[in-house]
Design a protein with these regions (language model features):
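Mobile-element integrase/transposase regions
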Residues: 1-38, 44, 57-65, 69-74
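Hydrophobic alpha-helical segments, especially N-terminal targeting/anchoring helices
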Residues: 38-39, 117
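Hydrophobic (often cysteine-bearing) scaffold residues that line and stabilize catalytic clefts
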Residues: 34, 55, 59, 86, ...
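Acidic/histidine-rich, metal-coordinating catalytic segments
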Residues: 63, 75-94, 117-120
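Short hydrophobic alpha-helix segments
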Residues: 48-49
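Charged alpha-helix within mobile-element recombinases
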Residues: 98-110, 115-163
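Surface-exposed helix-capping loop/turn segments at secondary-structure junctions
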Residues: 71-78, 159-163
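Residues immediately flanking
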Residues: 20, 40, 89, 158
Length: 163
């Protein structure tokens, strides 16, 4: 469980947060899931994906991507960065497969307390920004949603000022 309600990381990759957002798609009259992982120090989105179904194996693949493309190139292990991964109690995050994968890769998974979005505040805030951006749209297909998300994430990571 989370020790501190708010996080104050001192460097990139110290505290990472992940969460899943739901977005309605008309094609099959159902929600799509958007999985996002953010670095709380830089506010950069390290990985995102959208699908009609996200399973624990998808979460693992997302973290394999983060490790290969972000953590390893920045020598996080060699630098001795104690990486904390904050997430809620979603069954995909609490699955034994994910917990073991995190341990094997020196990632310290921390679960937020129920009904305390402030403990995962950066990703919750990010998903609120995303919701506001997506609000005016009606998505007819997952491809249409993915196109809008691709532009949004690129602009968010590359054009906005990160505090």
């Amino acid at each position: 469980r989370v020790k501190y309600r708010k996080v104050f990381p001192n460097q990139p990759f110290e505290v990472l947060e992940m969460d899943i957002k739901f977005v309605w798609v008309e094609e099959y009259k159902m929600h799509c899931y958007v999985l996002t992982t953010i670095d709380t120090f830089t506010r950069i989105v390290l990985h995102w994906m959208v699908a009609y179904s996200i399973k624990k194996q998808d979460v693992k693949r997302a973290w394999e991507h983060i490790i290969i493309n972000h953590l390893q190139p920045n020598n996080c292990l060699e630098k001795g960065i104690n990486i904390e991964v904050r997430n809620d109690n979603d069954s995909r995050f609490s699955a034994k497969l994910i917990q073991e994968f995190f341990k094997e890769n020196y990632l310290n998974q921390v679960f937020t307390h129920p009904y305390t979005p402030q403990e995962n505040g950066h990703i919750e805030s990010f998903h609120a920004i995303l919701a506001k951006k997506l609000c005016p749209f009606t998505f007819w297909s997952i491809d249409e949603l993915e196109g809008v998300l691709t532009l949004f994430y690129e602009k968010y990571n590359n054009e906005r000022l990160h505090s």
